[in-house]
Amino acid sequence: MPRSIKKGPFVDPHLQKKVLEASASQSRRPIKTWSRRSMVVPEMIGLTIAVHNGRQHVPILVTENMVGHKLGEFSPTRTFKGHVANKKSR
């Protein structure tokens, strides 16, 4: 169920502060965050945000198409190795 429109998008306060500082200083360094639950807002466009996936920080360049999605959607937590082939059927 999506968040109520009257509440607005959720962005962790510490991440919002870092985004505003980076956009004001035109910094190109990635912003590290563990907040996968934060929503991508228009202030983040053009910034690189390193989102933690449980093992490492995955750098993500935020574009206009990402606005309204959560940061965790762009940093997969599971790696699919593929199904094991059945050697008996061959």
UniProtKB/Swiss-Prot annotation:
Protein name: Small ribosomal subunit protein uS19
GO molecular function, one term: rRNA binding
One term under GO cellular component: small ribosomal subunit
Ion transport among keywords: no
Keywords: Ribonucleoprotein, Ribosomal protein, RNA-binding, rRNA-binding
Gene Ontology BP term (one): translation
Keyword RNA-binding (UniProt): yes
NCBIfam families: rpsS_bact
The organism's place on the tree of life at top rank: Bacteria
Coiled coil start-end: none
Chain's role: Protein S19 forms a complex with S13 that binds strongly to the 16S ribosomal RNA.
The encoding gene: rpsS
UniProt xrefs under InterPro entries: Ribosomal_uS19, Ribosomal_uS19_bac-type, Ribosomal_uS19_CS, Ribosomal_uS19_SF
UniProt record similarity statement: Belongs to the universal ribosomal protein uS19 family.
Gene3D superfamilies given in the database record: 30s Ribosomal Protein S19, Chain A (3.30.860.10)
SUPFAM superfamilies in UniProt: Ribosomal protein S19
Pfam families named among the record's database cross-references: Ribosomal_S19
